[in-house]
Amino acid sequence: MAYAVDVARPLVPEALELLSDAVLNPKFEAWEVEAAAQRLAADAAAMKEGNPQGGLLEALHEVAYTGALARPLLAPTEVLSRLAPEALSRFVAENFAPPRVVLAAAGVGHSELVNLAAPLLESSSSSSSSSSSASPVRAPESKYVGGDCRQFSASGVTHLMLGFEAAGGWRDVPGSVAVTVLQFLLGGGGSFSAGGPGKGMHSRLYSRVLAKHGWVRTCAAFSSLYNDTGLVGVYAAADSSNAAQLVDVVSEELRELASKPVPAAELERAKAAALSSVLMNLESRAVVAEDIGRQVLTYGTRKPVSEFVDAIKALTPASMCAAVKKATATPLSMAALGDIAALPRYSEVAARFK
């Protein structure tokens, strides 16, 4: 979780005091908790009805992992109905203790930030330890296992996700960089785009799937990376009459990437797009501050940008092929929504990657 504030430089002391007080000393009113629970229930219903990709990604995590990563991002209705101020206060006491908090900033000097933050965090630490007997929670564990989840829908459209483990997650810098570049290499999107080359029209899923198979509505790469693990794969949608063909097409694209190196020109284009994305994002101070915080939580320090740039530049067609082969050697995770009767069995799809 992240809390942020954006202010003019002279107002940093006041903003920091407000931010630390809101994060570390929150007050939960019963009516506020009830209103928030109602909004979350509405968000969950909206995702179910209008965001099949988001719903499938939730389902994919549920079958791909055991442990914390298998739990839904949007709380089930039965959990929301039991939500109370006391539960939220206990959660904050256990998880928002200063030893587990990273304060990151951009546009302010490090020494100045430390001098401003130290008394605020020390005060909160002493007050929280005296007012709460809760012990800090251990980092949750998750294990990748793979699996299958299918939900019937009479919408006439079948949505599909095929995913594999990106073992090592963010802490495996070469591996996470390969996943990032792979997402640009595969690219994809919807069957209609008003864009041009800058919109990824030369990516593999556009040129090899969407441009060749008019019945495919959507085909795009996805990735969800965490500290020590992650998911990488392809999301696609088509008319239900083409559901079985959709599995064939997506499977073949992933198998080909794992079996032979991509042309050097394609990889260089994907690497250039990844480099551009990384460097352009870091032009924003808000992104820089978030990046510092995330890296300190993940690596214990902030790595220089050059380390990621060098890792991207070092990728070769052979190393990209090896990275995809490593991922597709893990158990398949598959999620589908639509005419599931027309889809091949999980064991048949998984066997294609053996």
Enumerate the predicted regions with their spans:
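Basic, alpha-helical interaction scaffolds
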Residues: M201
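Charge-rich, well-structured scaffold segments of protease-associated domains
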Residues: M1-E141, R150-Q151, S155-M161, A166-W170, ...
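Active/ligand-binding-proximal structured segments within catalytic/core domains
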Residues: D43, L60, P174-G187
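Short, flexible/disordered intra-domain loops and linkers
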Residues: G189-P197
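Soluble C-terminal extramembrane regulatory/interaction domains of multi-pass membrane proteins
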Residues: V145-G146
